[in-house]
Amino acid sequence: MAETQRPVLVVDFGAQYAQLIARRVREASVYSEVVPHTATVEEIAAKKPLAVILSGGPASVYAEGAPQLDPRLFDLNLPVFGICYGFQAMAQALGGTVAHTGTREYGRTELNIDGGVLHGGLPTIQPVWMSHGDAVTDAPEGFEVTGTTAGAPVAAFEDRARRLAGVQYHPEVLHSPHGQQVLSRFLHELAGIPASWTPSNIADVLVEQVRAQVGDGHAICGLSGGVDSAVAAALVQRAIGDRLTCVFVDHGLLRAGEREQVQQDFVASTGAKLVTVDAVDKFLGELKGVTDPEEKRKIIGREFIRSFEDAVRQIVDEQGAAEGKQPEVEFLVQGTLYPDVVESGGGTGTANIKSHHNVGGLPEDLEFELVEPLRLLFKDEVRAVGRELGLPEEIVARQPFPGPGLAIRIIGEVTADRLATLRQADAIAREELTAAGLDRQIWQCPVVLLADVRSVGVQGDGRTYGHPIVLRPVSSEDAMTADWTRLPYEVLERISTRITNEVAEVNRVVLDVTSKPPGTIEWE
């Protein structure tokens, strides 16, 4: 992206919210990247940023070993916006005063506004989300104080002439209801950055990048049925046409209709070449008698690699035979997203890609150069690009689904009968959530079969002894944390009634109301 988009750099001072800040910048139609606080001023300048945002962080600016802000950053004459710790570090570097006031503010706090570019016209008293012990007590010379709280005499300031500003609170979180507006005003009004980061522009840039990387070569992409691999494949197909071959391994652990969705909807909307590997019997055979969730995952991962490897070998050999020369499928497409890049230490998302990367346990003689067209995108951007490329909503809006599939939503041994039971219950839950218009209000809704548990019930004139089904609806922005979704009672009632009436082996439906933490989203 660097060739065409100058970024706003989010300097990460160890905040759990650095990625969220980058997302909020992009929601304001401005491209952003995360860089570590160890990045030097020279490294920052080399990226030619349009602006710099200093994130929050857990440290005190006075603590030994706390991340420091190099004052030379301000010699670059860039717009700079400080948040929480970044606000304090900015104030200190420019000659202001940061002190231990003895008053800590955590959680919801009232902010009192006194004009300014960023807050002008907004409610003069507004709720914000705070998380600080130290506070700025005197603003640097040239700054106007535009906000105060009970525990922070300087909670917001601006130096409009130098395009510098900052806030003590967290504008990036939903608990600061005017925060996105404040961030947008910094980007567009104070920094003067145009709103040019849009799905159509993103798609055009990514297609050109793939063309430049692949050239006249051939590529392979493993489709999982999920949105990431589907959008990655659609982008590459748009770029190189029938020189892309997609491989879809059906391990029998998918939800109802997902194989058909890939084979029909994806192919129809993209025109991509698709090879389907039917490995249902192979996977179920290997999973026979296995109840330990970690063992399930290992078996599924191993067998998937073997199945994909066999398909890739066949494609490589056929490609070479068709062209009358040595096989030349040089590229492997993966749906890596920006959070994966940041969390693996890639930081800015511009780390060099190894020219021949041995991926995912493939044998050493199958070496590919990675094509990762989504590596600078967040999940919501991937969906937007998918829509821009014309992928059907059934694929683009698909909820996250684990790689091991329904195997880790069956608590107990995985069998064909148990898969059929869970598949039917899951389909009912999804149908009712869609009918109620709740698909986009939840992150995902795992449906879990307690296959090794039976409960007594009464249906008709007789007693039943069936399995419980667990509904696990959760709301989240990034799956790092999640809250259970408060679904309307009438929707829950319809789901429960239909499952217990239509799924023969189930006589009880229960609701999981555990947040993450302490519970994970998936049961296994």
From Swiss-Prot:
Coiled coil: none annotated. It catalyses: XMP + L-glutamine + ATP + H2O = GMP + L-glutamate + AMP + diphosphate + 2 H(+). Pathway: Purine metabolism; GMP biosynthesis; GMP from XMP (L-Gln route): step 1/1. It is an enzyme of class 6 (ligase). One of its GO terms (cellular component) is cytosol. Its EC number is 6.3.5.2. Residues 197-398 form the GMPS ATP-PPase domain. ATP binds at S224, G225, G226, V227, D228, S229, A230. The active site is at C84 (nucleophile), H170, E172. GO terms for molecular function: ATP binding; GMP synthase activity. It holds the Pfam family GMP_synt_C. Keywords: ATP-binding, Glutamine amidotransferase, GMP biosynthesis, Ligase, Nucleotide-binding, Purine biosynthesis. Signal peptide: none annotated. It comes from the Bacteria. InterPro entries: Class_I_gatase-like (IPR029062), GATASE (IPR017926), GMP_synth_C (IPR001674), GMP_synth_GATase (IPR004739), GMP_synthase (IPR022955), GMPS_ATP_PPase_dom (IPR025777), NAD/GMP_synthase (IPR022310), Rossmann-like_a/b/a_fold (IPR014729). Residues 7-196 form the Glutamine amidotransferase type-1 domain. Catalyzes the synthesis of GMP from XMP. Homodimer. This is GMP synthase [glutamine-hydrolyzing].
